[in-house]
């Protein structure tokens, strides 16, 4: 069995015997090497007797040289004759004069050592560092074992009891206690105590202790092994000492740390020999303890040990930790040979599967292959001569090199490698020069451009790797992105420009209206300049006359016949969908050739079109002036309304901004209409070749609203554009936004990279493991609708390529069977029948213990076939979510901080057809319109509820039939008014509004704020009649603006107060990426909403508790049952008294927490909530990520459960364990007829889930390395190497793709008929 051939790996504590077993000798001297002879000192840290010879097959004194003395130990110098490489594997040890504790276990929380002994970690520390005594044995009942004594107490007790008890300081005492522990007995005691314990605090403590005791028993570790009596010394070559140019030495920090341990240990030995006074010995023992602490984990306790230049020394723990540690630096990312790197330039003449490699580079990369070929062709007599020929780049070499590289693909990689398309394989083509040539169509996959980007080339060496490169990684196989199923190798820029220009039509061109009998005639006429490129002509094709243009005829010539369309103008979008449909029909190879033809066509005619940009092309629309004047008038009117007290400041601000947003749009429209269809800038933007309308608006329209430093929109817009030029003030206002964009980019890129890393860490073990898990579960999917009723993701997009979880039935007719994959035809059918909900299989409900099955995953998005077994879908999911993260971060960059207009919503529309019914709506008539005066009423159509705020105008009548999209109510977009339904006099109760004066306009506003007199009761307004009788009472929330004064008269329909609606700020991905992180980390959002836990009716009580409002939700079925919520006075309620409400609905304003959704609505709802919230962020940014990728991550977040009742199992309550482990245990318990385990699902954020993953190697390489390893060692954890990371770290083939475990057992059989001929 080879060293590589193992299935699992285990980590345990090392016993003192084990350390000696590893060792090849004791290091007793702190010396390293002799400064004169430069030979290692005997018994020192580099001793050749212990660690092996420094030169191959040669002993230290030189008596025995050469290989024939292999294995001999020289009698003169005692060194074994062997390879020098053993200095990398032979260990030594230091025998300590006094035991010391291992800092990983004596410090940190939970503190293992103190838990096992049953003292606090503070007490443990005081004993270990010689401040207190601990009693280790006692015959006296008053002095119990484990008691902590100060110096005074110890002396007093010694006088009293003499030798009836023993107490020690330092690790000696702890060692004695730990050795004496009987783990089984301790476990039974703790279990009994736990059964009797009644306080939660005590139970928690006992559970912690019991867990550690059980871990020790299960793993076969002994507690006293946490105390070191021998310290292992790692092999000499792993802590090297090298001579620098100036004769000085550079050495690893570890050598310094070891030297301190050895020095102190030797000094302690001497002190003990000469029987030094107690106090000196104790001090030396403490220093030894500190030296060993520093060696294991420097800086963990006390001041870190520093070198001369005040730099902290790197200890053994630091060698493992962090990005520079062993795991991430050397095991997960290695530097590789057979690689090269250079600048890239465009190679438009290459085929899709080719790349240009400079001759010099190829010569070096393929060196051994060229040498072999030279010898094989007898152009060189031996390898040595061949090497010389290659190095002199002899003419013979050029003859060979073409053949050598002919079938030998290379891999190209561009950093940052964000997804799997950042590494692709190409067939090399030799070129002159020193730059690598890249095919223009793969640029978007690599995210490369030619402004100085560099790329790395790697050579495939083994036949297997060459095979995989050709079959899986060739560029033509990567036309489609695995994250969304959309084409990614799409022509861009010049190529689009050429195709767009050629397929446009222009009335009145030369030869318009001519008739042609066939395509050849058109082309001849065009080449002879008898007809213009864009002229509308008629051509006979397949027996019918088709109206088209010569340009379109030429473009369609390069397409297969079935895909031709002579009426279309091809911009980037059209070309993209063309590529998609081509791929669906013809597969990769043909599509690749076709895209190449489109590329050549585009470049050729793009050059021929001669599109260029001059400043005259940016025409400022003549209408701009009048539009701006109109806007200025509107703003003046708004200011007037504000001064007269009709509106409040916030409304004035928002209305002003809305006017300017609208004007900016109008100017943009005017600009676009004003431009000629063939204006170069217009063509570039509309075709998708370069730039967009928002950039054009800034160049030739107006810049519009800008955001200030706080992210609020400035109410004075920038009226100028870049062609007219900005004034100094305008420039100053806009510079902040532009710079913020750049700063954001820099900060966010790092964030996004870290997000990707966490996602990979949590999902790398998800592999397609089986064909079918035979579950009947699934998730119900419908179109994803945003807050403003806009469809974010269509149903067809969500279910494309998924598998049905149950038969699809519509009106009693079966349309498709269960387990059918949904493809294009079925999608069309579903849309045609108007089906709104479909139940599909999903990774979330997959029943496999590990990984997912083919059916639950569905289609492989990168090739539209069923996903293959062994596919690493987890990593693909992580990359698909992480890669756009980096793009999202760079969104603000090009538009230069222009504030995005939040669209103003001022009406509610019906979401479906049906009959209207009202619930809890009170209206009064004002100016002939029905105005709502109640809060929280609803309009119900079929089973869809539409909430109606007060102040809304109702546009439908009860019982009216409406169609989807009909307007139900209109309302003011900026505020919710509180309207008087009576004539009368106003009386304020329990509040005095704060008077706010606006200096600029000299206007007073009255804001309702919390004051001393309103502590106990809510602010209200009574409307009184002439006899001062109450006609009506209105609750006024804090933050409302009073529109009438105390004692004023009001008429029916007057506005008493206004509540500001929360506005959307500028939407920047700043909202985006942090939001995605918040969701995946399952953090409680800031200002979270209170949700109702049961269905019922709202009761808002007038009494207060703890100065908070009381809101009850009383169940409708059982009026006895209700839930009480205490709402702080400042929070805004979104419910009213008597409103019917469902479990999970909001009671107060705010963001929803996933934990609340889980507790109230259960697991499925919580999973869907995270999935849909993430999807919303990505869709807002215009990024398509398929649901299934997010589902895989969410599945990993929910893989753990919390034990509520452990039944007959050995689990402890409140323990968080993988669901699959608990389910297995329950299966066993069920078979034995014992009590089952009860549990509840828990959400773990991605960081936590990655640290708590089943594999300790993967977890240690992620974060908190020392903690993970120390815990795993105590548990004696076994890593079954199921994920990808563990296998990469151990240098094994990953268990995915061609390394998938099921493929290992495949036997190759020949069919009897076609056996290969015997030679």
UniProtKB/Swiss-Prot annotation:
One family name in Pfam for this protein: RNA_pol_Rpb1_4
UniProt entry tagged with the keyword Transcription: yes
Binding site for Mg(2+): 449, 451, 453
Positions annotated to bind Zn(2+) 2: 773, 846, 853, 856
Cofactor info, note text: Binds 1 Mg(2+) ion per subunit.
Record-linked PANTHER family: DNA-DIRECTED RNA POLYMERASE (PTHR19376), DNA-DIRECTED RNA POLYMERASE SUBUNIT BETA (PTHR19376:SF54)
Family listed: Belongs to the RNA polymerase beta' chain family.
Protein name (database record): DNA-directed RNA polymerase subunit beta'
Organism: Fusobacterium nucleatum subsp. nucleatum (strain ATCC 25586 / DSM 15643 / BCRC 10681 / CIP 101130 / JCM 8532 / KCTC 2640 / LMG 13131 / VPI 4355)
Lineage per the UniProt record: Bacteria, Fusobacteriati, Fusobacteriota, Fusobacteriia, Fusobacteriales
């Amino acid at each position: 069995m080879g060293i590589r051939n193992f299935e699992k790996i285990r980590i345990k504590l090392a016993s003192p015997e084990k350390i000696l077993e590893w060792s090849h000798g004791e290091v007793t001297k702190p010396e390293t090497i002799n400064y004169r002879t430069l030979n290692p000192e005997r018994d020192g840290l580099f001793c050749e007797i212990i660690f092996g010879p420094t030169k191959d097959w040669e002993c230290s004194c030189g008596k025995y040289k050469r290989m024939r003395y292999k294995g001999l130990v020289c009698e003169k110098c005692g060194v074994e004759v062997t390879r020098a490489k053993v200095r990398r594997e032979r260990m030594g040890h230091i025998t300590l004069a006094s035991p010391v504790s291992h800092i990983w276990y004596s410090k940190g929380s939970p503190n293992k050592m103190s838990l096992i002994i049953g003292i606090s970690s503070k007490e443990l520390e005081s004993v270990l560092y010689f401040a207190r005594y601990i009693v280790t044995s006692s015959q006296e009942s008053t002095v119990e074992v484990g008691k902590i004594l100060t110096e005074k107490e110890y002396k007093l007790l010694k006088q009293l009891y003499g030798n009836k008890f023993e107490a020690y300081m330092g690790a000696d005492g702890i060692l004695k206690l730990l050795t004496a522990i009987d783990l089984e007995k301790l476990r039974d005691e703790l279990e009994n105590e736990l059964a009797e314990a009644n306080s939660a605090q005590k139970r928690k403590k006992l559970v912690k202790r019991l867990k550690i005791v059980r871990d020790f028993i299960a793993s076969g570790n002994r507690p006293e092994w946490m105390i070191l009596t021998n310290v292992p010394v790692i092999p000499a070559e792993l802590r090297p000492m090298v001579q620098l140019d100036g004769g000085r030495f550079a050495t690893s920090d570890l050598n310094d740390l070891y030297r301190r341990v050895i020095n102190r240990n030797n000094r302690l030995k001497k002190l003990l020999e000469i029987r030094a006074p107690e106090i000196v010995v104790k001090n030396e023992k403490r220093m030894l303890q500190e030296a060993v602490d520093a060696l294991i984990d420097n800086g963990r306790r006390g001041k870190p040990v520093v070198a001369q230049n005040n730099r902290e020394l790197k200890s053994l723990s630091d060698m493992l930790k962090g990005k520079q540690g062993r795991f991430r630096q050397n095991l997960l990312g290695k530097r590789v040979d057979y690689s090269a790197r250079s600048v890239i330039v465009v190679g438009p003449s290459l085929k899709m599967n080719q790349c240009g490699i400079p001759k010099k580079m190829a010569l070096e990369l393929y060196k051994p292959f060229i040498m072999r070929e030279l010898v094989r062709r007898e152009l060189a007599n031996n390898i040595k001569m061949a090497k010389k020929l290659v190095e002199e780049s002899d003419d013979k070499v050029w003859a060979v090199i073409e053949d050598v590289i002919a079938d030998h693909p290379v891999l190209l990689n561009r950093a940052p490698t964000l997804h799997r398309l950042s590494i692709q394989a190409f067939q090399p083509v030799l070129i002159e020069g020193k730059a690598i040539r890249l095919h223009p169509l793969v640029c978007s996959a690599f995210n490369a451009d030619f402004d100085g980007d560099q790329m790395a080339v790697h050579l495939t060496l083994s036949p297997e790797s060459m095979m995989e490169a050709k079959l899986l990684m060739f560029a033509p196989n990567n036309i489609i992105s695995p994250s969304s199923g959309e084409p990614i190798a799409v022509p861009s820029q010049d190529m689009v420009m050429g195709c767009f220009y050629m397929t446009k039509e222009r009335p009145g061109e030369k030869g318009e209206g001519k008739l042609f009998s066939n395509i050849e005639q058109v082309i001849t006429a065009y080449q002879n300049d008898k007809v213009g490129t864009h002229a509308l002509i008629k051509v006979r094709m397949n027996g019918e006359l088709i109206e088209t243009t010569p340009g379109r005829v030429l473009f369609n010539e390069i397409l297969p016949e079935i895909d031709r369309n002579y009426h279309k103008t091809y911009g980037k979008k059209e070309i993209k969908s063309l590529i998609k449909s081509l791929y669906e029909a013809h597969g990769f190879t043909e599509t690749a050739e076709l895209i190449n033809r489109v590329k050549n066509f585009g470049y050729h005619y793009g050059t021929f079109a001669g599109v260029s940009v001059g400043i005259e092309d940016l025409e400022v629309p003549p209408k701009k002036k009048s539009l701006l004047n109109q806007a200025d008038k509107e703003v003046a009117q708004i200011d007037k309304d504000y001064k007269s007290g009709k509106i409040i400041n916030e409304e004035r601000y928002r209305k002003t901004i809305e006017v300017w947003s609208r004007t900016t749009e109008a100017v943009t429209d005017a600009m676009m209409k004003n431009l000629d269809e063939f204006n170069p800038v217009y063509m570039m933007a509309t075709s998708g070749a370069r730039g967009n309308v928002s950039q054009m608006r800034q160049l030739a329209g107006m810049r519009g609203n800008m955001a200030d430093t706080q992210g609020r929109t400035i109410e004075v817009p920038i009226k100028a554009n870049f062609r007219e030029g900005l004034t100094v003030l305008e420039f100053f206002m806009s510079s902040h936004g532009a710079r913020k964009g750049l700063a954001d980019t820099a900060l966010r890129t790092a964030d996004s990279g870290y997000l990707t890393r966490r996602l990979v860490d949590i999902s790398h073990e998800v592999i397609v493991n089986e064909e079918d898990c035979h579950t009947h579960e699934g998730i119900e999917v419908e179109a994803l609708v945003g807050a403003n009723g806009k469809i974010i993701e269509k149903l067809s997009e969500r279910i494309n390529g998924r598998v049905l979880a149950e038969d699809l039935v519509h009106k009693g007719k079966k349309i498709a069977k269960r387990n059918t994959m949904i493809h294009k035809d079925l999608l069309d059918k579903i849309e045609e029948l108007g089906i709104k909900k479909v139940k599909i299989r999903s990774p979330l409900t997959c029943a496999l213990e590990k990984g997912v099955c083919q059916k639950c995953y569905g289609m492989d998005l990168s090739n539209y076939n069923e996903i293959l077994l062994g596919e690493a879908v987890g990593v693909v999911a992580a990359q698909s979510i992480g890669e756009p993260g980096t793009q999202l971060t760079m969104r603000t960059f090009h538009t230069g901080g222009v504030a995005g207009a939040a669209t103003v919503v001022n009406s509610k529309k019906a979401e479906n057809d049906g009959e209207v019914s009202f619930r809890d709506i009170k209206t009064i008539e004002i100016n002939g319109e029905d105005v709502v005066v109640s809060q929280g009423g609803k309009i119900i159509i079929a089973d869809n509820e539409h909430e109606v705020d007060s102040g809304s105008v109702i546009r439908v009548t009860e019982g009216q039939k409406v169609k989807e999209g009909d307007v139900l109510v209109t309302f003011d977009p900026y505020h919710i008014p509180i309207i008087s339904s009576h004539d009368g006099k106003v009386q304020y109760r329990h509040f005095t509004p704060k008077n706010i004066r606006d200096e600029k306009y000299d206007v007073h506003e009255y804001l309702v704020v919390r004051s001393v007199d309103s502590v106990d009761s809510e602010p209200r307004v009574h409307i009184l009649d002439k006899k001062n009788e109450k006609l009506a009472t209105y609750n006024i929330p804090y933050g409302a603006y009073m529109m009438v004064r105390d004692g004023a008269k009001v008429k029916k329909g007057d506005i008493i107060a206004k509540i500001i609606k929360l506005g959307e700020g500028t939407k920047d991905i700043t909202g985006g990426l942090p939001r995605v992180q918040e969701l995946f980390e399952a953090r409680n959002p800031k200002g979270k909403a209170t949700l109702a836990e049961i269905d019922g009716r709202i009761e808002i009580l007038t009494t207060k508790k703890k100065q908070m409002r009381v809101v009850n939700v009383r169940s409708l079925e059982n009026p006895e049952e209700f839930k009480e919520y205490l709402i702080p006075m400042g929070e805004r309620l979104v419910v009213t008294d008597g409103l019917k409400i469902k479990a999970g609905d909001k009671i107060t304003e705010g963001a929803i927490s996933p934990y609340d959704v889980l507790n109230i609505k259960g697991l499925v709802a919580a999973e869907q909530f995270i999935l849909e919230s993430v999807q919303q962020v990505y869709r807002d940014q215009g990024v398509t990520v398929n649901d299934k990728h997010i589902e895989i991550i969410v599945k990993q977040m929910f893989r753990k459960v919390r034990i509520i009742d452990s039944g007959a199992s050995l689990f402890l309550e409140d323990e968080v364990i993988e669901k699959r482990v608990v389910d297995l245990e329950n299966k066993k318990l069920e078979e034995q007829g014992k009590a089952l385990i009860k549990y509840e699902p828990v959400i773990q954020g991605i960081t936590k889930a990655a640290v708590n993953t089943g594999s300790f190697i993967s977890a240690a390489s992620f974060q908190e390395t020392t903690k993970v390893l120390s815990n795993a060692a105590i548990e004696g954890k076994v890593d079954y190497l199921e994920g990808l990371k563990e296998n990469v770290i151990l240098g094994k083939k990953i268990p995915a793709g061609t390394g998938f475990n099921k493929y290992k057992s495949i036997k190759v059989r020949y069919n009897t008929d076609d056996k290969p001929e015997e030679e």
